[in-house]
Amino acid sequence: MKKKWKPSASIKDLMKRSKIIADIRSFFLKKNIMEVETPILSQSGVTDVNLMPFITNYFSFNDNIKKKNLWLITSPEYHMKRLLSAGSGSIYQICRSFRNQEFGQYHNPEFTMLEWYQLSCSMEKMIEEIDFFFQKILNFNKADKISYQEVFMKFLKIDPLSTSLSELFQCYKKFNLKNLIYLENDLNQLIENIFTLQIQPFLGKEKPLFVYHFPSEQACLASINKKDSRVSERFEIFFKGIELGNGFHELTDYFEQRKRFIKDNRKRCDMNLPEQKIDDYFLDAIHHGLPTCSGVAIGLDRLIMIALNKNSIDQVMSFSFERS
């Protein structure tokens, strides 16, 4: 008899997972940061070209209610920022998130996210807060920090803030990656891909590493640095070559955020991807007034995987995608 009915992780490891999550909740309780719950189903998708949301629909036998498309959240970010705009104060959430076309050693279409927003907090201060969190909850060593520009110079001898297409083509050729050049004129996409393939696997080998000041073209929902408009107030966290989290000093400019969403959808068209419905509730919340804050989204399954010295996230999940 096949044993796929059994959990992906051992009961012993699931008990350890439960303890870590309890410790996380205790950490935030002591800091007087409110835990919140927000919808899993959203009336809008996300425009980020790197995210593929699941879509479903609502319908009723009542003729007055028409069939309605709904999206499973890729993160609770938009709803949590609506709470921030409504005056919630600093908040966190542990919840399920969903991303299509993502399955493997470090990916599962359904996964657990820790999302945390801290009011009146700079990017630098947020990095310190997260570093302390890792040390306190998981006994990690104090993290290192390096800028996106510095890490490119260290590994590839390329300045990502001033590089050219020809220089990047040579770099792709050097690493036998020319077959991955599918948008030849998209400088930013080439930079992102080479970072993922030739830099990320070597990051944070001994202890966590924060890479900060991502190029402004990769700002997503982060603000732009006031001293250097070429870079954003965005950072990512890596440990043992694995991305653990993505954080921002949050963008609070309604007009800039709307412009970025529109630009995302244009890029989706260029990549033959479906456009996504822009979340007007979220934009209205920013227009009302998103307070100055920083936030981070941490993949909890990956974090627990590293803490328990496992090789893949299915070893710390009760039932992975293949056993769901």
From Swiss-Prot:
Its EC number is 6.3.2.-. InterPro entries: Aa-tRNA-synt_II (IPR004364), aa-tRNA-synth_II (IPR006195), aa-tRNA-synth_II/BPL/LPL (IPR045864), EpmA (IPR004525). GO terms for cellular component: cytosol. Transmembrane segments: none annotated. ATP binds at residues 99-101, 108, 243-244, 299. Substrate binds at residues 75-77, 117, 250. It catalyses: D-beta-lysine + L-lysyl-[protein] + ATP = N(6)-((3R)-3,6-diaminohexanoyl)-L-lysyl-[protein] + AMP + diphosphate + H(+). Pfam families: tRNA-synt_2. It is an enzyme of class 6 (ligase). HAMAP family: EF_P_modif_A (MF_00174). Belongs to the class-II aminoacyl-tRNA synthetase family. EpmA subfamily. This is Elongation factor P--(R)-beta-lysine ligase. It comes from Buchnera aphidicola subsp. Schizaphis graminum (strain Sg).
